[in-house]
Design a protein with these regions (language model features):
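Conserved, well-structured functional cores that handle cations and Mg-NTP chemistry
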Residues: 1-226
Length: 226
């Protein structure tokens, strides 16, 4: 009989839990929580993601099927749909956002020496957004059009390893240019983006390659100093 650790527990061992605990403390995630801690919440959702669960009911049924083994997987609290739904609704999302950023930074280090087909030593990023449709009756706060709900996912992808280095979720109506105000540019890096991000008021400090069809007016030419 196998007496070793479950594969899930072995995977979770690689997580920087000291950063997670720090985030929980910073945002008081476990304040007045008695049974289902932030750690339980994260482990349940991580398990759901890794095993392709599709609903809260699916998560509940799957985890309850291995109820005697949950302790060895690190899950101490009782798992139910209502508990998961309440945690998803009430818990401070910044706990998991900060932890996700720490995981992303760890993953990027694993691919930092990976060669690009373009033979560039500098970091190359791809910036884009995608609109995710939502059922308006279930998500009334995400109104996009009269009878349609949506949110927009803005992603900055590090092409070494194809790892997202920056992620923002906004209202579906938010213009793509919004993300340029959120980004902290990396010196010497290349950013690949489509024409939706063309805005001279934001990009005048950058060297960029534009489309031949672009229409612009030069209001003033400055002589090079020195």
């Amino acid at each position: 009989m196998n007496t070793g650790k479950f594969v899930f527990a072995q995977l979770m061992e690689h997580s920087p839990w000291h950063i997670f605990r720090r985030s929980v403390k910073r945002y008081r995630g476990n304040h007045k929580v008695k049974t289902f801690s932030c750690m339980d919440h994260y482990l349940c959702m991580a398990f759901a993601q890794l095993t392709h669960r599709e609903s809260l009911r699916d998560i509940e049924v799957c985890l309850r099927a291995v109820q005697p083994k949950l302790y060895h997987m690190g899950i101490r609290g009782k798992v139910s749909r209502s508990t998961l739904a309440r945690a998803n609704e009430k818990r401070d999302w910044r706990i998991y956002a900060d932890f996700a950023q720490a995981l992303i930074e760890s993953a990027r280090k694993l691919y930092c020496d990976e060669a690009l087909e373009l033979e560039l030593e500098e970091t190359v990023y791809a910036l884009d957004s995608t609109t995710i449709d939502l059922c308006l009756s279930l998500f009334p706060w995400a109104r996009f059009r009269k009878k349609k709900g949506a949110i927009k996912l803005h992603t900055l992808l590090d092409l070494r390893g194809n790892i997202p280095s920056f992620i923002r979720i906004t209202d579906g109506k938010v213009n793509d240019l919004y993300l340029l105000d959120e980004l902290i540019p990396e010196a010497g890096a290349f950013y690949v983006m489509d024409r939706g991000y063309t805005d001279f008021a934001r990009l005048y400090l950058f060297v960029f390659c534009h489309s031949r069809e672009i229409k612009f007016t030069v209001p003033k030419t400055l002589l090079a100093s020195g």
